[in-house]
């Protein structure tokens, strides 16, 4: 079966623990991810939601695997756009590997569907979000483009 996949690798001057917190804790995500935050208990098998600033659920799914501070796997479905939601669930994997004074972050977002609209969308969004995360951890300042939820969404 054909699938769609987006892979992004970056190196961030931080510790695995700090990067893990930045990926999972609302006080961090709101700073670099357009004011969004996760709602979950961060236990395997539990529900996961990505909340947007007005309280709507942007994306939802389940925590599939969690190995703090090394690996996080989420089942992920868009909740905003009916045609994207209809594609069903994707899988998003974060791998954190210490590399001296840095951490190698590998993100793989994939779906068992050829030419997935969701994977097309996240391939546009993840580079900006993860660049802003890197900037926040290395300089203390997120990128301006990701500080606020886009108007009209």
Language model segments and positions:
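Short beta-edge strand/loop motif at the mouth of beta-sheet-based domains
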Residues: 7-8, 14, 27-60, 147-153
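Intrinsic-disorder/low-complexity, polar/charged segments enriched in Ser/Thr/Lys/Arg/Asp/Glu/Gln
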Residues: 3-9, 47, 58, 71, ...
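Short, highly charged C-terminal tails/helix-capping segments
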Residues: 135-153
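Beta-strand/loop substructures that line and gate deep hydrophobic ligand-binding cavities in soluble
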Residues: 81-127, 146
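A short, structured loop/turn motif at beta-sheet edges
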Residues: 16-17, 64-71, 95-104
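Short, charged/polar surface micro-motifs in flexible loops or helix N-caps
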Residues: 54-57, 65-72, 78-80
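Hydrophobic pocket/interface hotspot
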Residues: 19-20, 29, 48, 63, ...
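Hydrophobic/aromatic beta-strand elements that line small-molecule binding cavities or substrate pockets
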Residues: 10, 60-65, 90-97
């Amino acid at each position: 079966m054909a699938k769609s996949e987006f892979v992004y690798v970056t190196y961030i001057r931080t510790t695995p623990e700090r990067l893990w917190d930045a990926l999972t804790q609302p006080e961090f995500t709101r700073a670099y991810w357009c004011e969004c935050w996760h709602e979950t208990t961060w236990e395997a098998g539990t529900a996961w939601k990505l909340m947007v600033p007005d309280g709507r659920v942007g994306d939802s799914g389940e925590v599939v695997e969690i190995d703090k501070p090394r690996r996080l796997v989420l089942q992920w479905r868009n909740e905003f756009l009916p045609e994207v939601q209809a594609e069903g669930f994707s899988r998003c994997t974060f791998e954190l590997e210490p590399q001296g004074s840095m951490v190698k972050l590998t993100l793989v977002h994939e779906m068992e569907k050829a030419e997935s609209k969701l994977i097309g969308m996240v391939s546009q969004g993840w580079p900006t979000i993860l660049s802003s995360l890197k900037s926040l951890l290395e300089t203390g300042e997120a990128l301006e483009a990701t500080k606020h939820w886009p108007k009209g969404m």
